[in-house]
Curated annotation (Swiss-Prot):
Protein name: TorCAD operon transcriptional regulatory protein TorR
Annotated localization: Cytoplasm
Record's subunit section: Interacts with TorI. TorI binds to the effector domain of TorR. This interaction, which does not interfere with TorR DNA binding activity, probably prevents the recruitment of RNA polymerase to the torCAD promoter.
SUPFAM superfamilies recorded: CheY-like
Residue intervals of the Response regulatory domain: 4-117
Post-translational modification: Phosphorylated and dephosphorylated by TorS.
Positions of the DNA-binding region: 132-227
Keywords annotated in UniProt: Activator, Cytoplasm, DNA-binding, Phosphoprotein, Transcription, Transcription regulation, Two-component regulatory system
Taxonomic source organism: Escherichia coli (strain K12)
Phylogenetic lineage: Bacteria, Pseudomonadati, Pseudomonadota, Gammaproteobacteria, Enterobacterales
CDD domains, A to Z: REC_OmpR_ArcA_TorR-like, trans_reg_C
Chief site of localization: cytoplasm
Pfam families in UniProt: Response_reg, Trans_reg_C
Amino acid sequence: MPHHIVIVEDEPVTQARLQSYFTQEGYTVSVTASGAGLREIMQNQSVDLILLDINLPDENGLMLTRALRERSTVGIILVTGRSDRIDRIVGLEMGADDYVTKPLELRELVVRVKNLLWRIDLARQAQPHTQDNCYRFAGYCLNVSRHTLERDGEPIKLTRAEYEMLVAFVTNPGEILSRERLLRMLSARRVENPDLRTVDVLIRRLRHKLSADLLVTQHGEGYFLAADVC
């Protein structure tokens, strides 16, 4: 079954261009010009990925990203203006998986979409070596069937990107993972100048949610998980 992409874009020409392009690429595509329209689509259909313009007429796209992350692990790629550097960083902090800037380069955008969908599918298929589908470390239980993290029975909310980065660490316990390798493991990007800041943001977010000393920085080399995994 084709992946379902929702394009949230209020500019008619851009919306039509994106819809045509991704339909030709073989995706199921829905379009809307508002956050309200997006919510209606998500209530009635299964959605794999959202292309979300942060400048919407009815609400702020960054606030919408945060609201989505509170109840969903759907893939989110923000569409921003070329000068909106702060918005891009805030968007990642609020749970977006990636971003692109206008004017859009469609070939790059489709690669980013394919790569995000690839890692979404990979995370869905991930299976641990334990019978109950959990990786256990330092009192935490990462369940790869339900895509959940718990400590002492208490759930810890993770965005999709946070979850996938944690999967990378628990499947490579004690191994130093460079920022470049983590970025490849997260998105397998094949575009020029991949944004390593994405890795830094995710590490900081995970450290805030986990014990701060679990993800250790090896200066000049990368990061590793300082815990036994079983």
